[in-house]
């Protein structure tokens, strides 16, 4: 059952190209302003909102006057370069009218899959959210190759949602949800307001993209749903063609909810604790053990020994002085730097390493403390 959007903690909103850009006139300014009002209302209600926005290529086509025919790869990348500037300015103007700051982040799918870049991207987005700014995230179509041809912003939005621990992903599109068959082809198609699990039968209901401006169809949205739901993020597919597309969901306008079976934090920590083989070990003192059990991050001062050859973002096991594993997490340093700062206070790290580094060796959001029974068995 759909909750009110204000009852969610962190929402990622993905916006399709056809919603933002009219082929003849360019940016749909009035629609974007209505979206800005919705985002402002959610932020004022205490909800963190992130936007994954398509539209750079579509907008860049109009800016550069490119022909309506299919674009070559280099033409698409040129259109993206021009469109990203126009798109970022439009979001800044619209949100700025409500006293809200925004920041543009250009990523590719590999940025959410390669662990070191993943940590950097997540830290940047987290900082924007702490500063009450709305991250405007777009696929970096000026340099992407495979992604630019297949249109992965739905999947990218799902990866951003899982990376940031969002509890809801909203895909705004030119269709109002999932039907048993593509409704533009089959007038007898039945609407599905709720999907518990994305099965092969559900996937068979997907069709191709109906709009020429959109690169993704229902199939990519269902792929996004599988990514999101598996990580504990619920997903909504709904039409964004209405003014105030987010408030329309709360008004009861048609939408399909794909419910997640568990909470995002639990899913993320399950992945850390169970699906990754530790690349190294950190032995910590009794004070660090106590801090970790109380929910704190692991600071370098409590680390007594570093074993293994690992890179930043790898999984490491945290051991007590008796050699028992008490926690596991993603480390913010490579092995060489971890050895240099082990045992030192956080305010000494920059001087030791010669660059500004993170205060925590493992942030509490990336750390799973094992239950006492598990630790004894380790």
Curated annotation (Swiss-Prot):
Keyword Kinase assigned: yes
Chain sites annotated for binding ATP: 14, 173-174
Residues reported to bind substrate: 54, 141, 153
InterPro entries recorded: AceGlu_kinase-like_sf (IPR036393), Asp/Glu/Uridylate_kinase (IPR001048), G5K_ProB (IPR041739), Glu/AcGlu_kinase (IPR001057), Glu_5kinase (IPR011529), Glu_5kinase/COase_Synthase (IPR005715), Glutamate_5-kinase_CS (IPR019797), PUA (IPR002478)
Cystine pairs: none
Signal peptide: none
GO terms for biological process, alphabetical: L-proline biosynthetic process
Main location class: cytoplasm
Domain PUA: 279-356
Compartment annotation: Cytoplasm
Annotated Gene Ontology cellular component terms: cytosol
Record's catalysed reaction(s): L-glutamate + ATP = L-glutamyl 5-phosphate + ADP
Keyword annotations from UniProtKB, A to Z: Amino-acid biosynthesis, ATP-binding, Cytoplasm, Kinase, Nucleotide-binding, Proline biosynthesis, Transferase
Metabolic or biological pathway: Amino-acid biosynthesis; L-proline biosynthesis; L-glutamate 5-semialdehyde from L-glutamate: step 1/2
Function: Catalyzes the transfer of a phosphate group to glutamate to form L-glutamate 5-phosphate.
Family listed: Belongs to the glutamate 5-kinase family.
NCBIfam families reported in the protein's UniProt record: proB
Protein name as annotated: Glutamate 5-kinase
Gene name for this UniProt entry: proB
